[in-house]
Amino acid sequence: MKNDKVTPKKEKPKENLTVEQKVRREIIAWFWVGLVFLLINGAIGQARVIPSGSMENTLLIGDHLIMSRVGYDAGIPFTNMHVPLWRNPRRQQIIIFKPPFDPTQPDYVKRAIGLPGDTVDIHDNAVWINGQKLIENYTLGKTERIENSDVKMPYKVPDNCYFAMGDNRQNSYDSRFWGCVPRNDIIGTPIVIYMSLNASPEAWQPGQIGERFLAYLNGIIHPGTVRWRRLFHVF
């Protein structure tokens, strides 16, 4: 007869770790998680929050975005340095960039309207590119020139530059005021809205840590302040 007995597998001896060893293991594990997050956050993508209404109604105050840097810019972790890459914005694509007139300010979010070499003009409540009217179904308010601006129309976009405008045309500080955005200042484009809170605009201004904390706390206590329909909108 065949031997039907099954030889039991030997169990691996359990690790008898001290509390100190367990704590050390957890710290090391979370260290690597944090390091990977920082590398991804700096080099591949970043989170952004919309502090103003210049892109309404495409983007609302309190919209929280994930920005992709892939192909546009490589951030160097733990530094403020960045390296422009190979990808260039398409016409009418939303872009995120360092303000060329003051790179120390928070990043701007606008729409790329004029590409390098384009001639941009504004009249009859519309943007004209190289003599052709640009079809725009996302704007809010009248599209007008800025009187007494140093940017004169028609405007020839220089090489390696982009003419950027906010969708909220009467409430946007954009290329009509200060000229083009150099390609090297463009760091990415939004890919998804992961959170949107209807809170005081002051909460989303730089340095308003207390106000921002209260906005998040209020969102937890009062879920009605979350704009649920905007969540996970993909660009």
Annotate each PLM feature.
Residues 28-43:
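Hydrophobic membrane-insertion alpha-helices, especially the h-region
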